Regions:
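Gly/Ala-rich beta-loop-alpha elbow adjacent to hydrolase catalytic centers
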Residues: 105-113
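Short beta-strand/loop motif that positions the catalytic acidic residue
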Residues: 140, 145-148, 152
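N-terminal cap/lid segment of alpha/beta-hydrolase-fold proteins
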Residues: 1-27
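Conserved alpha/beta-hydrolase "acid-adjacent" motif
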Residues: 153-159
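Short, surface-exposed "cap/lid" segments of acyl-processing enzymes
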Residues: 16, 25-68
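Post-His helix in hydrolase/transferase enzymes
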Residues: 182-195
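Alpha/beta-hydrolase active-site loop
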Residues: 49, 78-97
Length: 197
């Protein structure tokens, strides 16, 4: 399925939020909001894991929204240690105001989406390489998809297992994958597409 991509701006609590919106050829079945990795370490809406997630959701018929957090790209504001970034995501979800919202995120973005999920009750929650070491990541709803690389040295698999264990939360572990899923992006896409069909 081919997607068309457009840039839009959403009013956020710290100013304009830049978003790339990837639309399927036909009317969307829902909306996926995909959050990028840490803004102070090069995370943007063009991150390859974020783009892979967007392609998977478009293939499934969702419209994929990829916002830049405050202070990144053309988004206004400055980094707020995870507090304001959750509010940025909430502003994007409010702008969409549609049924069938999926929240997805990678690394820092996954931690922020886990925080937002308690407030907006998404249809689905997809967390990839969740940054559980440096951020308070709350328990997530049953049925959430949590994907992690076996060889992740940025957020070791053991740390994610320690976070997931008290929740009885299953994890999908991608063998041989490190934090950025080099040479494993196709597996990441397949997992997401299977989960959200």
């Amino acid at each position: 399925m081919r997607a068309t991509t457009r840039r839009v701006f959403v009013a956020g609590p710290a100013g304009r939020i830049e978003c790339a919106v990837d639309s399927p050829e036909s009317s969307p079945r829902g909306y996926a909001v995909i959050a990028h990795p840490h803004p102070q370490f090069g995370g943007t809406l063009d991150n390859k894991v974020v783009q892979t997630l967007a392609r998977a959701f478009v293939e499934l018929g969702y419209e994929a929204w990829r916002p830049n957090f405050r202070g990144v790209g053309q988004s206004e504001g400055r980094y707020d240690e995870g507090r304001g970034e959750v509010e940025d995501l909430a502003a994007v979800v409010a702008q969409i105001a549609g049924q069938g919202i999926v929240l997805a995120g990678f690394s820092f973005g996954a931690a922020m989406q886990a925080r937002l999920a308690a407030r907006v009750k998404p249809e689905r929650l997809v967390l990839v390489g969740t940054a559980v070491l440096n951020f308070d990541v709350p328990p997530v709803p049953r049925g959430s998809l949590v994907i992690h690389g076996e060889q992740d040295t940025t957020v070791p698999l053991a740390a994610v297992l320690d976070w997931a264990r008290p929740q009885d939360l299953p994890l999908v572990v991608v063998p041989g994958a490190e934090h950025f899923f080099h040479r494993r992006l196709h597996l990441l896409r397949d997992i997401v597409e299977s989960y959200c069909r």
